[in-house]
Amino acid sequence: MKFVLFAQLAAVAAPAIAIDLAVQAGQHVMYSYPGLTPPESLYKLTSEGKVGGLIIFKENVNSNLPAIMDKFQALYKASPAYNGHPMIITTDQEGGNVRRVPGGPSQSARQIGDSSTPMQAASQAGRDAAAALKAQKINGNLAPVLDIYREEGNFIDEFGRSFGNNTEIVTSCGSAFAISQSRSGVLSTVKHFPGLGAAKKGENTDLVPIKIDLSLDEIRTFDEVPYRTAIRNGVDLIMTSWAVYPSLDAKYPAGLSRKWTTDELRTRLGYKGVIITDAIEAGSLKSFGNDGQRGVLAAKAGVDILLASGRNATQGEAIVNEIVAALKKGTLSMTEFQESSKRIQALQSRLSA
């Protein structure tokens, strides 16, 4: 009789454990959706506590966006995931041609870096970005870019996304933008660690695998310089690159590489904050399984937030399911994952409720 009762209790308890894991895993996944109207499935996942955040694209933006964001926040607040702090909602508002919502910054990073008063312009750009995002009820920006371009018109310079071609201007402008933006109430993300400044024109990690064959010494004494300052300044998030850097890891792109993410960024550079991937569906990752498998690899590497930006709610859900399965099997460390969850909660606490 005791065995039967125990079996019945176990059968009841098992789903609760699964739900708890799904909620925990969900806080590590940032979802996206197509068009102007979110699908009901995404609202449902949010109410179940399986959505940790959103990324907004230009196709999602009209006059109804603030009300939609309020609805997501209300569902999140009523969900089992709520920890007293808001859901993180982000977009890419770098400036110039790279703006997802109406408003500033009107100048590109390159225009700011080339101006007569670059630090002042960068500070104003950070404030302008924050104002534009807050008007849409968005509380995080996947900007500024800290890549230091090597050639005029290369991948990162083509649309003016880099502040310049030397460590001084990128460090000073990137820091000014990030600090003023964060002080204005919007989370700042610096990207793309350890640097995409050497990528040639057309070498877009969103589309194809890219290898950046620089010496480790050059990366550490040049490309990483702006990140060291950002870390000292307490930057909110760091986004990793999807390029491969053979000088430290010839197999995995930086965002899937424990050598780059944990050993270099966390241990060597001392970063204790939140790390976020670039788009998990990127073409550069085609050799690393489906989106869920990539999410597990990134989590194993030490990344905290997985960016499911394919405009499909099922993409984020698939990543959550793979994370849960890996935690159950023990192929993803529960201890490390819980530490990662604490970092995300600490980040959320920086946002006003």
UniProtKB/Swiss-Prot annotation:
The keyword Hydrolase applies. It comes from the Eukaryota. Residues 94-119 are annotated as: Disordered. Its EC number is 3.2.1.-. Residues 105-119 have a biased composition (Polar residues). InterPro entries: Glyco_hydro_3_N (IPR001764), Glyco_hydro_3_N_sf (IPR036962), Glycoside_hydrolase_SF (IPR017853), NagZ_Beta-hexosaminidase (IPR050226). GO terms for cellular component: extracellular region. Belongs to the glycosyl hydrolase 3 family. This is Uncharacterized secreted glycosyl hydrolase ARB_06359.
